[in-house]
């Protein structure tokens, strides 16, 4: 049995057509079903529907053989015990700093609000900058507006939400896309099955971007 961990939302919507290329189609619509374990048209493949931030944990600990996770989540989580064999080139965005339009960056200690605490620590350590990291789980844009932080670090797609709140994207940190991840033990135990799936998905990704 192959178990694939996915999270609802944009990643799921973009991943399902790629899985369909490999003949893997859920027997129920994951967006409408309340089930968290969903069979597929292949008897030996099932989907686990979990939170985006939990996908690497399920895969690392072997509760899922494979998963699809954003590079932002993998950068924050660390990705130990995982293979990352394929960039699916879906859910594209950028990880960036952002701040209020026209604000001058303070020379002293910087206050940065983000849910990507580990990424922020590494980023500013590489710059030799002292920062106070404030962990938030959502509505990052509020932090600079009410004086909680000087900057935020968040994923930026169109930038419309930032601009609507008087903020602007500033420093680029990383390009983000969704990656296929594989449990290392599963790769050894089910190598032929998993490698065949990787190859099929790679062809589907390449075909989509050629078109």
Curated annotation (Swiss-Prot):
<dbReference type="InterPro" id="IPR001348">
    <property type="entry name" value="ATP_PRibTrfase_HisG"/>
</dbReference>
<dbReference type="GO" id="GO:0005524">
    <property type="term" value="F:ATP binding"/>
</dbReference>
<keyword id="KW-0368">Histidine biosynthesis</keyword>
<keyword id="KW-0808">Transferase</keyword>
<comment type="pathway">
    <text>Amino-acid biosynthesis; L-histidine biosynthesis; L-histidine from 5-phospho-alpha-D-ribose 1-diphosphate: step 1/9.</text>
</comment>
<comment type="function">
    <text>Catalyzes the condensation of ATP and 5-phosphoribose 1-diphosphate to form N'-(5'-phosphoribosyl)-ATP (PR-ATP). Has a crucial role in the pathway because the rate of histidine biosynthesis seems to be controlled primarily by regulation of HisG enzymatic activity.</text>
</comment>
<keyword id="KW-0547">Nucleotide-binding</keyword>
<dbReference type="InterPro" id="IPR013820">
    <property type="entry name" value="ATP_PRibTrfase_cat"/>
</dbReference>
<dbReference type="InterPro" id="IPR018198">
    <property type="entry name" value="ATP_PRibTrfase_CS"/>
</dbReference>
<comment type="similarity">
    <text>Belongs to the ATP phosphoribosyltransferase family. Short subfamily.</text>
</comment>
<protein>
    <recommendedName>
        <fullName>ATP phosphoribosyltransferase</fullName>
        <ecNumber>2.4.2.17</ecNumber>
    </recommendedName>
</protein>
<keyword id="KW-0067">ATP-binding</keyword>
<dbReference type="InterPro" id="IPR024893">
    <property type="entry name" value="ATP_PRibTrfase_HisG_short"/>
</dbReference>
<dbReference type="GO" id="GO:0003879">
    <property type="term" value="F:ATP phosphoribosyltransferase activity"/>
</dbReference>
<keyword id="KW-0328">Glycosyltransferase</keyword>
<keyword id="KW-0963">Cytoplasm</keyword>
<comment type="subunit">
    <text>Heteromultimer composed of HisG and HisZ subunits.</text>
</comment>
<keyword id="KW-0028">Amino-acid biosynthesis</keyword>
<dbReference type="Pfam" id="PF01634">
    <property type="entry name" value="HisG"/>
</dbReference>
<dbReference type="GO" id="GO:0005737">
    <property type="term" value="C:cytoplasm"/>
</dbReference>
<dbReference type="GO" id="GO:0000105">
    <property type="term" value="P:L-histidine biosynthetic process"/>
</dbReference>
């Amino acid at each position: 049995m192959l178990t694939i961990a996915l999270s609802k939302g944009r990643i799921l919507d973009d991943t399902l057509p790629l899985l369909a290329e490999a003949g893997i189609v859920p027997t129920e619509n994951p967006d409408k079903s309340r089930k968290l374990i969903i069979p597929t048209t292949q008897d030996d493949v099932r989907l686990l529907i979990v939170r985006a931030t939990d996908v690497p944990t399920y895969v690392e600990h072997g509760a899922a053989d494979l998963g699809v996770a954003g590079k932002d989540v993998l950068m924050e989580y660390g990705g130990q015990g995982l293979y990352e064999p394929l960039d699916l080139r879906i859910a594209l965005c950028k990880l960036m700093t952002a701040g209020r339009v026209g604000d001058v960056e303070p020379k002293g200690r910087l206050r940065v609000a983000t849910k990507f605490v580990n990424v922020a620590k590494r980023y500013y350590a590489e710059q030799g900058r002292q920062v106070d990291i404030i962990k938030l789980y959502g509505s990052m844009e509020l932090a600079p507006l009410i004086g909680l932080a000087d900057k935020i670090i968040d994923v930026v797609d169109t930038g419309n939400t930032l601009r609507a709140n008087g903020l602007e994207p500033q420093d680029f940190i990383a390009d983000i896309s969704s990656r296929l991840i594989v449990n290392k033990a599963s790769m050894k135990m089910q190598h032929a099955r998993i490698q065949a799936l990787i190859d099929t998905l790679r062809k589907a990704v390449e075909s989509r971007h050629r078109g």
